[in-house]
């Protein structure tokens, strides 16, 4: 029978000093011997997705204590990618993921916690906590802060729905008036919560459902809705139940590595492909799989992308649907239900509810279960009131959206496309693969041949786009922005947004060893591996080279001979794999990250071989 980890510091005569300190935190005599559960919060006033989380930790903690556990809360950092975007702050975003994972490990192991409830929400916080959960392998439940309501404003006598990407695109368009930009800016982000589309934050919170590590509704229930409170309360109760099952009944099926199996990672990736999620999820799932000891690779993602259809098109891929609409259509359980009916998920995986995924779908899929309370749960909708308060409204749609022909979530027969919303491309420009979010690419440019225009940094690319250097037919190559080369693997939301602002959204492609925001759409290909700083062929491209992109055949190639490629490689080996004439101040902390970072095909995790 597994022994409580916390017994190390709560039991035995020689732990009198530790117990004295525990007592100073409020523990009583009868608390020693109960599971100590870490409530891992991420409240900050810097991030709208986390600004409402201040009281959530104590909400969960109170429920844990009612159920027979001892709750101890601590906080992690949280970076807002949207605020950090477009300047040097973005260099810190991806490294913060690993810092979060490490800090959770440090706190939990230093204090011998028995279990965790992870209260996350935004882009790198959920992945960082997920990596920590897989690394620590103690009972864990995720509960996120929830999505923001979609922005809405009236322009030209027409009500339109918005998100932060609309503000960025319009602001860079010289033909748009200041008054229009001001109206969009003030309306784009109306409430607390993670940005309202299927961007990275919401994609990752949805994937925790598919992995089985969070409760149904976690990825889609609005941050402002009163029903979300029950997810926090239930997480507090359920984590104590998981502790009992593991520590008292020796049931290891409740542990993260038992839940996060290869099949569970396939389920999560299949969901991501079906919903056209952020390409960043590829990076984070690969990293989490490595922490879990699961051999899940780019080749597996490529295989899944060829058979899983795209069943939903959500902002930023359309302005018709946002996360509030996904929830109305049955949320992630609705999407997984359609994948199940298509024979495309594994139903035997475990979940934190103690059920198999198949059993959970029987209970929570609105198509197969007509229970009135279930449908009421998925009718939870927006209030349209600006607020930073969680659980502040109880508005509901009149009906759920169960239209699987033309609705927000489609069935396989009526799929938006029979191939999924993400694709892996291979070729001499990316021997280890690169990623494109096909759900955001107009089918007219799924095959694209263009002329390379090369930039050694995101900043130079932005200047080139806004300065008119980038023309129709160009493939914009932004290199030395990978995990090692940046360092930090910046997101390229500004370059892709500015291409749209300049009327080039369907007339150009963009290739980078950096990554993209979940808000990116267009022919934007990222994660080119190996990256330039690791000797990848993207570092050998020259202005005027012809690049051929073929999404249907999953290919991306530089149209030069093998002899020419080899000659360029030999020349670059002599020069060194570093950007030419780039001025960038890089802190010691970022240099450490870059020194250990692997390329994106490995999840940009640390290269452990460097420690041997």
From Swiss-Prot:
- Tell me the cofactor note: Binds 1 [2Fe-2S] cluster per subunit. This cluster acts as a Lewis acid cofactor.
Instruction: List ligand-binding residues for Mg(2+).
Output: 81, 123-124, 491
A Gene Ontology BP annotation from the UniProt entry: isoleucine biosynthetic process
Catalysed reactions listed for this entry = (2R)-2,3-dihydroxy-3-methylbutanoate = 3-methyl-2-oxobutanoate + H2O; (2R,3R)-2,3-dihydroxy-3-methylpentanoate = (S)-3-methyl-2-oxopentanoate + H2O
Record flagged with keyword Magnesium:
yes
> Recorded GO terms, molecular function?
2 iron, 2 sulfur cluster binding; dihydroxy-acid dehydratase activity; magnesium ion binding
State the pathway, as annotated in the record: Amino-acid biosynthesis; L-isoleucine biosynthesis; L-isoleucine from 2-oxobutanoate: step 3/4; Amino-acid biosynthesis; L-valine biosynthesis; L-valine from pyruvate: step 3/4
Database matches in HAMAP family: IlvD
To which protein family does this belong? Answer: Belongs to the IlvD/Edd family.
Q: What is this protein called?
A: Dihydroxy-acid dehydratase
UniProt lists the gene as ilvD
